[in-house]
A protein has these predicted regions:
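Short, function-defining helix-loop hinge/capping sites that tune catalysis or transport
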Residues: 70, 89, 108-111, 142
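Flexible, active-site-adjacent loop/turn segments at secondary-structure boundaries
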Residues: 42-44, 56, 106-107, 113, ...
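Residues that scaffold the ATP/ADP-binding catalytic core of kinase and kinase-like folds
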Residues: 39, 107, 152
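Glycine-centered loop/turn positions within well-structured domains
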Residues: 34, 80, 115, 138-139, ...
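Glycine-rich active-site/cofactor-binding loop and its immediate structural neighborhood
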Residues: 93-136
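N-terminal subdomain of lithium-sensitive/metallo-dependent phosphomonoesterases centered on the IMPase/IPPase/PAP
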Residues: 2-102
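Acidic beta-strand-loop-alpha-helix segment within the catalytic core
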Residues: 120-168
Length: 168
């Protein structure tokens, strides 16, 4: 799990830094979403990345999009680390980006609308930001420690929760 692979020492970040990281993440997932949509429901090259039992598919699109995301992160934040699904971990200064280029590869491969791109940032102990983009619906979900939101096209809504004392 990615949480086990990030730095064990938390890195302090300011509110302004968090806002910048969130803007960057939102822009990047939307950017790669265009590439994903152009390849959705097309012929894909698929490999099995499992190490034994079962089938763990990875497509040429997974690899390409993760490479694009890694390159963008490295250009913008060269000191940050990266953990991704398709390539090895890249150590950094304690701030670590966590990438899943296609969360729902099987759905993507079969033309089903149950996939998206995940991008998050950890300070070494906790998540700082998280984004999930579904390009086929132009839906972006995001969260930081103090708020969360949903954007569809140009319309944005704050996501709220309420206390739940029991689950049953």
């Amino acid at each position: 799990m990615a949480e086990e692979r990030v730095n064990s020492n938390a890195v302090a970040v300011s509110t302004d830094d968090i806002a910048e990281y969130l803007r960057f993440a939102q822009s990047l997932v939307r950017q790669v979403g265009k590439e994903l949509l152009s390849r959705f429901r097309t012929d894909l090259s698929v490999d099995d990345k499992s190490t034994g039992h079962g089938f763990d598919p990875v497509t040429d699109v997974d690899k390409k999009v993760e490479r694009v995301m890694r390159d963008a992160i490295t250009r913008q934040y060269p000191a940050h680390g990266i953990v991704g699904e398709e390539y090895g971990d890249q150590p950094g200064n304690g701030l670590t980006w966590v990438i899943d280029p296609i969360d729902g590869t099987r759905a993507f491969m079969t033309g089903m609308l149950h996939w998206g791109t995940l991008l998050g940032l950890s300070d070494g102990l906790r998540p700082i930001i998280g984004t999930m983009y579904q390009p086929f619906a132009d839906e972006l979900f995001w969260g930081i420690s103090t708020e969360a939101g949903y954007r569809h096209g140009n319309n944005q809504t704050t996501i709220r929760t309420r206390c739940c004392k029991t689950l049953a």
